[in-house]
């Protein structure tokens, strides 16, 4: 399940750099085009299992295990700067993409990942929202000033 999902984090630094409304829109579409199949796989997996909560927990465990394997040092820890970037990436790209599937159990999947993420990673009690809310939070340029 979710083989290779850790690759969604390959361009984390680039996708978070100079994050503006226009670049966020483009980055999100590129992210969905490249990695949307992982999020469809998540929803299909939940559909295929009778215990939906357990299925969502398994998805969360799989994702987090792959993140730890990719980013942890030899001591088994993720450095604090990388963790902050991963947290922001989850908030800006991963959770909105999950919710963007508009699947019946998308919120359950997001809740499970969010909860497990906070338990597993130090100082990572993050929240999530959908794409439209995030997109709306970016300011428009006013007379080219902002």
Language-model regions, residue ranges each:
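Recognition helix of helix-turn-helix/homeodomain-like DNA-binding domains
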Residues: 119-131
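Alpha-helix capping and inter-helical loop/turn segments
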Residues: 50-51, 100
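Basic amphipathic recognition helices
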Residues: 68, 72, 76-111, 115
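Intrinsically disordered, low-complexity regions enriched in polar/acidic and amide residues
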Residues: 13, 28, 82, 124-126
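Residue-level detector of alpha-helical secondary structure
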Residues: 2, 6-20, 25-50, 56-75, ...
């Amino acid at each position: 399940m979710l083989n290779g999902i850790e690759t969604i984090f390959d361009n984390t630094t680039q996708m978070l750099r100079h994050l503006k409304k226009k670049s966020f829109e483009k980055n999100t579409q590129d992210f969905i085009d490249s990695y949307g199949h992982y999020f469809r796989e998540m929803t299909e997996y939940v559909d295929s299992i009778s215990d939906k909560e357990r299925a969502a927990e398994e998805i969360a465990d799989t994702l987090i295990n792959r993140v730890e394997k990719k980013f942890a040092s030899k001591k088994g820890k993720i450095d604090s700067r990388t963790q902050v970037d991963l947290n922001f990436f989850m908030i800006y790209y991963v959770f909105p993409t999950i919710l963007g599937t508009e699947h019946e159990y998308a919120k359950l999947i997001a809740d499970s990942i969010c909860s497990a993420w906070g338990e597993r990673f130090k100082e990572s009690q993050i929240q999530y929202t959908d794409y439209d809310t995030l997109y709306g939070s970016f300011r428009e340029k006013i007379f080219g000033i902002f």
